[in-house]
Design a protein with these regions (language model features):
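Residues immediately within or flanking Cys/His clusters that coordinate Zn2+
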Residues: 1, 17-19, 46-50, 68
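Short cysteine-rich clusters marking metal-coordination/redox-active sites
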Residues: 4-7, 22-25, 53-56, 71-74
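Charged, low-complexity helical/coil segments in non-catalytic cytosolic or luminal regions
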Residues: 88-291, 317, 329, 338-414, ...
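Canonical alpha-helical transmembrane segments of integral membrane proteins
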Residues: 323-338, 412-427, 449-455, 477-488, ...
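Alpha-helical membrane-embedded segments
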Residues: 353-356, 445-456, 481-486, 497-523
């Protein structure tokens, strides 16, 4: 507890004044001078209260704040368990300079542009749940100098010949990259950290625990070796971009070499590359959590620069209403400008259904990557698990899945063979008899079946997580029926247009059903699985 020396009231760090402020008598104190008066001796540890969520295991630390009744990471409304602990003192800290009111304004502006965002995202009570957390980051400093030798090239045409000129780009370089930051917490997704980067290294100050007053902090559990390669990649990319602006290089017109080639130069004998041992720093982040069922959405703002990112799912009711309001004028305009036959309408519906299947498949791939934390090095390095089964019969279920997967794969090819036997003989008969009924619409109808098969194989190949597979068959059924029915009618080519218009209505209904499935999958993609921190390892042992 940090108490006011005048009235013994609770002290908090005031963002506007950048000083400690008493909540009762409004006394302002310099955080460094106050800390000196409190510390009997310098120590590389400082005492904190650790609050743990009983549902997900997430931890946040504080020096003097009673935890609110909800978890920052999983959004659960619960009483957090607490205990005292000594934490390793970081080297630096950037105090908050953006207030909670700044968060509300920035987030409200972001949500205002998201027309289909859930109504709760505009609720003032919800916006008041922004929580200030200091996230641990590793700070990297690199210096390099020496002779630079790179290869460039310029390709152009002269008549029928394609000519490539090769250039040797040489020079001397002397550069320093200081204050490069990467998060040291496995609970803070690397993609989110990248979205709010960079922090202003010039604002870093020596750490003192009193600056944490009124805020929370996360514990480091990712070692500094994890991001050494990404740091060099970042330095190489920035260096190449800067070199491309040098007049001597730019005047040649040559294409600059890749960042990988520059990185190889950094590690070569002609370059003196040096780095300091990375140090830990606490950097300010505003955090807002929205939870629905078994998914969470985060809004995160850089507490120093104000840069914000947010997960924004879609409200299905708003989406349906907006789609109807948009579709009516579009349909009216098209009806006046374009005369479409029944075959054209049916073909267009079929194409739209195929496109929806491709979009659906791409979403499945993105969901699998996101839920497995494929782009989060810190998550993997901390020994975290994206999800596992602890049941004793998990191995048997896996083997059972393998058997059914094999049957399903062979079944696809059998189905394709059956379709070829049924559809293409009809087209061949039209061609051999010269009946004149072999039209482009008929050919498309047959080809669309092959495309449908390819789309289904594409979808099944990308659905490699349970979240992605959930309700998948139902969600794609509409488009599958749309393509199948359209193909059958186009190949049959009945005399009456009623078949084409009836098929178009059926196909349109199927596409609408599938688009609802796409929105459902988008909402999964726009949110995150509930975190589990019970397998979280580390603390000061890993983050050393």
């Amino acid at each position: 507890m940090y108490n006011c020396p005048n009235c013994a009231g609770n002290l908090v760090f005031d963002i506007e004044s950048q000083k400690l402020k008493c909540e009762y008598c409004s006394t302002l104190l310099d955080p460094y001078e106050y800390q000196k008066s409190q510390d009997a001796e310098e120590s590389d540890m400082f005492g904190v209260t650790v609050y743990t969520c009983p549902q997900c295991g997430g931890e946040i630390m504080t020096t003097n704040v009673t935890a609110a009744g909800f978890c920052t990471y999983c959004g659960a409304s619960t009483i957090l368990d607490s205990r005292m602990r000594d934490e390793k003192r970081p080297a630096h800290i950037i105090p908050f300079t953006r207030t909670k009111e700044d968060c509300r304004k920035s987030y409200s502006s972001l949500v205002r542009r998201a027309l289909f965002a859930p109504r709760e995202f505009r609720d003032p009570e919800f916006l008041d749940r922004f929580r200030g957390i200091y996230i641990p980051y590793w700070v990297y400093n690199y210096d390099f100098s020496g002779d630079l030798h790179l290869k460039g090239s310029k390709t152009y045409r002269r008549g029928d010949y394609k000519i490539t000129d090769h250039y040797s780009l040489s020079g001397e370089v002397d550069a320093r990259y200081h204050g490069l930051t990467y998060d040291a917490s496995s609970s803070f997704d690397d993609t989110v950290a990248a979205a709010i980067a960079p922090f202003e290294a010039a604002k870093m100050q020596p750490f003192t625990p009193s600056i944490l007053c009124g805020f929370y902090a996360d514990a480091p559990d990712v070692g500094n070796e994890v991001y050494r390669e990404p740091v060099l990649n970042s330095i190489s990319q920035d260096s190449i971009e800067r070199l491309s602006g040098v007049p001597e290089y730019r005047s040649s017109g040559a294409d600059m070499p890749s960042a990988d080639e520059f990185k190889n130069q950094l590690r070569g004998s002609s370059m003196n590359l040096s780095s300091e041992e990375p140090v830990c720093a606490y950097l300010p982040v505003w955090f807002l959590t929205y939870r629905k069922d078994d998914r969470v959405a985060y809004a995160v703002m850089n507490g120093s620069t104000g840069k914000i990112t947010a997960d924004l799912p879609v409200d299905k009711k708003k989406y349906i209403l907006g789609s109807i309001l948009l579709a009516v004028p579009i349909f009216a305009v098209l009806a006046f400008l374009i005369t479409m036959t029944g075959q054209m309408v049916l073909t267009a519906s079929s194409v739209l259904a195929l496109v929806s299947l491709v979009i659906y498949g791409l979403e499945l791939s993105a969901i699998s990557d996101k839920d497995s934390h494929a782009d989060d090095k810190g998550f993997a390095a901390a020994g975290r698990s994206a999800g596992s089964s602890g049941s004793p019969d998990a191995g048997d279920k896996k083997a059972e899945k393998g058997v059914f997967a094999a049957i399903r794969n062979y079944g696809k090819y059998a189905l394709l063979f059956l379709v070829v036997l049924l559809v293409f003989p009809r087209l061949g008969l039209d061609y051999l008899t010269g009946s004149g009924n072999l039209t482009g619409f008929k050919i498309y109808g047959a080809v669309s079946v092959i495309l449908l098969f390819g789309a289904l194989v594409f979808i099944w190949a990308l659905a490699d997580s349970e979240t992605a597979k959930k309700n998948m068959v139902l969600q794609i059924a509409g488009s599958v029926i749309a393509v199948g029915a359209s193909a059958a009618i186009l190949v049959w080519n009945p005399v009456s247009d009623l078949w084409f218009y009836g098929g178009s209505i059926l196909a349109a209904a199927g596409v609408c059903l599938s688009f609802l499935g796409i929105i459902s999958k988008y909402n999964i993609l726009a949110t995150r699985p509930l975190p589990t921190f019970y397998d979280r390892k580390g603390g000061n042992d890993r983050a050393k």
